[in-house]
């Protein structure tokens, strides 16, 4: 059982297990969760929780643990600044009882736990911040199906938010290839197959948790301003999927020079297109959401990124979406671009589709 690996085999280690504390008195549950479980999760390493000594002090997981196979870096890193905000034992007991009831009757199946988490994210993230709009689930699924990811792909979302595209790609791969995947492919699936970047640490914490609930035990999500000088990744991925921020501009000084060489602009929606081309290996596919301005804008920066994609790579599809897709931002008109990085052109027949309803 995986829990035997995660929890220390001591009395204090075992006391952190849900089955051990869920039926206790509310005060005891509160003490165990706030003083043990929560601090332990923040210090999780190699997929293992740390233990506590007799004085109640946390004992960190040994770095050289012979059983450690992969460090749970993303999860512990983005839990570092998390705060325990549940105010009283009674509130926590209601949460524990509610989750136990839900688990017993509905979500013992792992996929359901992920679905529940995504449902809660929908409630949490209905408000767009800094140009982020929560991408509706059915639009994400459509985009993933257009790209048809396989277990041999390495998939990146450089504006990952809550990791919706990465989770949908993981589900697609499992649904289509679960019976034929090799152990090496499963190892990659759990760690290196999916990468995400964001500039919001809260989002990274949420996305790491979302991926872990979908069997990606050591997700590669990182704090990175994708279009800045700090991001020097190139030719690493075979698939890019994203709904990059398209309300923002970025400080000209911090923009990565090789993106400016493709499109000299401060507009994030254009810089991200140049970024996708840089992140992808030759032959890599991209499907991304862009505002209509990218298709019709008349500035030199708009023209140069369109020319780059059409003449030097292979544009395959432009799918115009209804303006109400991003409720409640009804005024935002968007499209999906699908293209392949070739470095040698190849744009011939482009599929244009006008989606009237979603």
Give the location of each predicted region:
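Non-catalytic, mostly N-terminal accessory regions of nucleic-acid modification and defense proteins
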Residues: 1-146, 150-151, 220-229, 320-324, ...
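Gly-rich Lys/Arg/Thr-decorated short loops/hinges at beta-loop-alpha junctions or inter-strand turns
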Residues: 122-125, 251-257
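Conserved S-adenosyl-L-methionine
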Residues: 130-242, 247-251, 258, 266, ...
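Short glycine-dipeptide loop
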Residues: 280-286
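Acceptor-substrate binding/catalytic loop of class I
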Residues: 294-298, 328
């Amino acid at each position: 059982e995986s829990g035997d690996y995660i929890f220390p085999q001591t009395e204090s280690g075992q006391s952190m297990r849900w089955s051990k504390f869920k039926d206790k008195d509310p005060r005891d549950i509160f003490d165990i969760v706030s003083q043990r479980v929560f601090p332990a999760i923040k210090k999780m390493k190699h997929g293992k929780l740390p233990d506590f000594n007799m004085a109640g002090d946390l004992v960190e997981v040994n770095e050289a643990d012979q059983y450690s196979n992969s460090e749970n870096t993303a999860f512990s890193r983005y839990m570092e600044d998390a705060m325990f905000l549940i105010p009283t034992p009674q509130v926590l007991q209601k949460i524990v009882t509610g989750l136990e009831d839900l688990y017993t009757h509905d979500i013992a199946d792992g996929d359901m736990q992920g679905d529940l988490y995504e449902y809660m994210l929908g409630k949490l993230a209905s408000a767009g911040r800094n140009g982020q709009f929560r991408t509706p689930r059915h639009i994400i699924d459509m985009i993933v199906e257009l790209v048809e990811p396989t277990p041999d792909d390495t998939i990146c979302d450089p504006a990952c938010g809550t990791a919706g595209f990465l989770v949908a790609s993981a589900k697609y791969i499992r649904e289509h290839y679960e019976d034929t995947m090799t152990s090496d492919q499963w190892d990659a699936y759990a760690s290196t197959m999916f990468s995400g970047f964001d500039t919001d640490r809260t989002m990274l914490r949420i996305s790491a948790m979302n991926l872990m609930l979908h069997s990606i035990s050591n997700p590669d999500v990182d704090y990175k301003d994708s279009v800045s000088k700090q991001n020097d990744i190139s030719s690493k991925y075979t698939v890019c999927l994203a709904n990059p921020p398209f309300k923002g501009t970025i400080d000209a000084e911090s923009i990565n020079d090789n993106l400016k060489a493709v499109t000299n602009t401060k507009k994030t929606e254009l810089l991200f297109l140049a970024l996708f081309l840089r992140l992808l290996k030759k032959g890599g596919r991209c499907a991304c959401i862009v505002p209509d301005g990218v298709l019709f804008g008349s500035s030199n920066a708009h023209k140069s990124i369109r020319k780059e994609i059409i003449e030097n790579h292979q544009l395959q599809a432009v799918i115009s979406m209804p303006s109400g897709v991003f409720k409640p931002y009804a005024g935002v008109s968007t499209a999906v671009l699908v293209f392949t990085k070739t470095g040698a052109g190849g744009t011939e027949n482009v599929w244009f589709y006008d989606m009237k309803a979603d």
